[in-house]
Swiss-Prot record:
Disruption phenotype: Leads to strong decrease of secreted chitinase activity, as well as to the clumping or clusterings of cells from early exponential phase. It is an enzyme of class 3 (hydrolase). Residues 313-471 are annotated as: Disordered. This is Chitinase 3.
Length: 567
């Protein structure tokens, strides 16, 4: 019966995928994570599926090994490569129904990679001969016989990026040999940006589809660190392909990933209109289709639910959302008693971004006068600019200040309407030094995939640069409510050489104004902390925090410039 349907489908004109649409659904097929995987053609009969990604070629460049769990007959070519007659038939069947079929290279478990660009470039010709419209090999020497794929997906997860830009560039050259159809290249980075494995590929090569894994990581869809805006910024500013499409990758069921599963109603809530209506939004991708097919509700299976969500997208009504990164600027001034000269240190930091986030950037400036200083002045200016069509309001945070001979502390707190979990690292300040630290919240997990794997990759995080003292603020994970905690820092008793009246005078002179600005769901929390160092020196620390809903984790602010004037 399937044979007759295949013949009949060849007689019908097929509508090819609209690669520029933002309502496509891409599904991974081949690893049977749902436990009841059907043959490829079964899923292609559904209007909910637009792109099917065969997974995986898990070993390359030599030898080459393919694995499709329960979906291949187990015969081999003369070169020892798995050969699949049923998949070959289904590829052509699906293509004649307007589906795009890609082969994914890599996966969470496998042995693959290149030692240099020359090897990768040569491997592009191997891929073309095996799966493209090439006549260099006999049909019986090709894994899918005479079936011609529509392109390849790079699901590289071993943190080895060498060669992939060269491979993609050479494949583009080979694609031009066949003008009868369109060929595509995809990549499946994990959500931390830039991805350790395909970061260079994404910045150096023309990639059509980016299937971002917003699961198994701290930047999962629905988390306070969901970093769509980081990827949007990549598409707008860094991608060589200005028509690139970003897919929000989700697990198709709770069993399909270690973390990050959201039911259809939650996915619909988290994919806000600014995401759906972005011209760079391509749709939703899923790991994997077998898991999604068995995950049902009253509206159908999970794949059908995802298709219903992306159909709501209207790129012609694209909106702009604004946000800012979490910026921590620390200025420290240390003083010891002596006589008669003064020293002024001034630091200024300005940053501009247009993304929504909850990452942290820290910069620290220290200046010390230990010889002839009777007074010291330090001022810090930090400003963040966002572009938005949303009206703004201003409220003043509540603050409390306490001063004694042993400790001086100031704390401020604000509240807004967003849920954020943020991690902040404050470096220990040492005299006459300039340093900066960046901390990205991490969650490292590893899940292997073998012949019948049930989970797709987990993993990569970005480690923090130097830090000594860490303060972590955790806020409930509800996107509609934010309760910014009050930050208070108390340290050891100041030395006797500095009197309480001196400290009070300097406190009044150096305390910056405290304000809160609400831009959409952005809350700015400015905290002033007085730190007494356990030496004959006193240290003043001022911290500025900006907390937002979506994380732009790549934003890194430059070192603040320091001007020292001696009188």
């Amino acid at each position: 019966m399937l044979y007759l349907l295949t013949i009949f489908s060849l007689l019908l004109p097929a509508l090819a995928i609209n690669a520029r649409s933002n309502s496509n659904v891409a599904v991974y097929w081949g690893q049977n994570s749902g436990g009841s995987q059907q043959r490829l053609s079964y899923y292609c009969d559904s209007d909910a599926v637009d792109i099917v990604i065969l997974s995986f070629m898990h070993q390359f460049p030599s030898p080459i090994q393919l694995n499709f769990a329960n979906a291949c007959e187990g015969t081999y070519t003369a070169n020892g490569i798995l050969q699949c007659q049923t998949i070959a038939e289904d590829i052509k069947y699906c293509q004649n129904k307007g589906k795009t079929i890609l082969l994914s290279l890599g996966g969470a478990a496998g042995s693959y990679g290149f030692s240099d660009d020359a090897t990768a470039k040569q491997f592009a010709h191997t891929l073309w001969d095996l799966f493209g419209n090439s006549k260099n090999l006999a049909t019986n020497d090709r894994p899918f016989y005479d079936a011609v794929l529509d392109g390849f997906d790079f699901d590289i997860e071993n943190n080895w990026s060498t060669g992939y830009p060269a491979l993609a560039t050479e494949l583009r050259t080979l694609f031009q040999k066949d003008t009868s159809k369109n060929y595509y290249l995809g990549a499946a980075p994990q959500c931390p940006y830039p991805d350790a494995s395909v970061g260079p590929l994404l910045k150096q090569s023309e990639i059509d589809f980016v299937f971002i894994q917003f699961y198994n990581n701290y930047c999962n869809l629905g988390s306070s660190s969901f970093n769509w805006d980081t990827w949007l910024n990549y598409a707008e500013t860094d991608s060589p392909n200005k028509n690139i499409k970003l897919f929000v990758g989700v697990p198709a069921s709770s069993r399909a990933a270690g973390s990050g599963y959201n039911d259809p109603s939650a996915v619909s809530q988290y994919l806000t209109s600014d995401i759906l209506n972005s011209k760079y939004f391509g749709g939703i991708s899923m790991w994997d289709v077998s898991a999604g097919w068995s995950n049902t509700n009253s509206n159908g299976n999970f794949v059908e639910n995802m298709k219903a969500i992306v159909k709501k997208a209207s790129p012609g009504e694209e909106t702009t959302s604004s946000s800012t990164t979490t910026t921590t600027t620390t200025t420290s001034t240390t003083i010891s008693s002596s006589s008669s000269s003064s020293k002024t240190s001034k630091t200024s930091t300005t940053s501009t971004t247009s993304s929504s986030i909850s990452s942290t950037t820290s910069s620290t400036t220290s200046s010390t006068s230990s010889s002839s200083t009777s007074s010291s002045t330090s001022s810090t200016t930090s400003s963040s600019t966002t572009s938005s069509q949303i009206s703004t309001t201003s409220t003043a945070p509540t603050s409390s200040t306490s001063l004694s001979s042993s400790t001086i502390s100031t704390s401020a707190s604000t509240s807004d309407t967003t849920s954020v979990t943020s991690s902040e690292t404050t470096p220990v300040v040492t005299p006459s030094s300039l340093s900066s630290a960046i901390t990205i919240p991490g969650d490292s997990t590893t899940t292997g995939i073998s012949k019948s794997s049930s989970t797709k990759p987990a993993t990569s995080t970005t480690s923090a640069l130097s830090s000594s003292t860490t303060t972590v603020a955790t806020i409930p994970d509800d996107k509609e409510i934010i309760n910014t905690p009050t930050d208070t820092e108390t340290t050891s008793k100041p030395p006797a050489i500095i009197t309480e009246s001196d400290a009070t005078t300097i406190t009044q002179n150096l305390t910056p104004s405290t304000t809160t600005k609400n831009v959409k769901t952005t809350s700015t929390n400015i905290v002033t902390e007085w730190v007494w160092a356990p030496t004959t020196l006193r240290t003043l620390t001022t911290t500025y925090q900006i907390l937002t809903t979506r994380t732009h984790i790549e934003t890194v602010f430059a070192e603040p410039s320091t001007v020292v004037i001696y009188n």
